[in-house]
Design a protein with these regions (language model features):
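SAM cofactor-binding core of SAM-dependent methyltransferases
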Residues: 1-32
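Residue-level marker for buried hydrophobic side chains located in beta-strands
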Residues: 4, 25, 43, 92-93
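Class I S-adenosyl-L-methionine
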Residues: 32-42, 52-151
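Short glycine-/small-residue-rich Rossmann-like dinucleotide-binding loops
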Residues: 47-48
Length: 151
């Protein structure tokens, strides 16, 4: 079973190398090609939170230089799915801060949901949140996908 990480910070690499000596480090996420990675059932990732956190300047998911790395992970998943004819990864898990729900008045979280839904069905549009605010838990289910979130 392949186990890999994308990290550029030397200390973080040292920690994972110490705790997971067989982990392969793929380097900068912007330079990874998903079609060249061995297929995996589960892909987990996070993106820097500074641009969507209430503690930061809230530049947003699209305008922020750090949090926009989310879209690099989505690109890698798209490339993996294309290379495996939609089979892998079977599951993707994304982690970030609760501020993502309110960043850009909820539009950033909707963009996250839309990116995930579009991996399987790009004809589906994620609706606006109920009453203008995202719930702390929810789901979107389609014919070829299911998506859930929880704080």
């Amino acid at each position: 079973m392949p186990v890999f990480a994308s990290e550029v910070e030397p200390y973080a690499i040292a920690v994972t190398t110490s705790r997971f000596p067989k982990m392969q480090h793929l380097g900068n996420v912007t330079e990874i090609h998903g079609d060249l990675i061995l297929p995996v059932d589960v892909l987990t990732f996070g993106s820097p939170c500074q641009d969507v956190s209430v503690a930061g300047k809230q530049a947003g998911l699209h305008e922020g230089k750090r949090s926009s790395l989310f879209f690099e992970a989505i690109r890698i998943i798209q490339e993996m799915r294309y290379a495996t004819h939609g089979k892998y990864p079977k599951f993707a898990v994304f982690e970030n801060v609760p501020g993502l729900f309110s960043s850009a008045r909820g539009a950033d979280f909707r963009a996250v949901l839309q990116a995930f839904v579009s991996l399987c069905d790009d004809s589906v549009l994620v609706p606006e949140p109920p009453k203008g605010k995202w719930l702390h838990a929810g789901e979107i289910v389609g014919d070829h996908y299911s998506l859930a979130w929880r704080v």
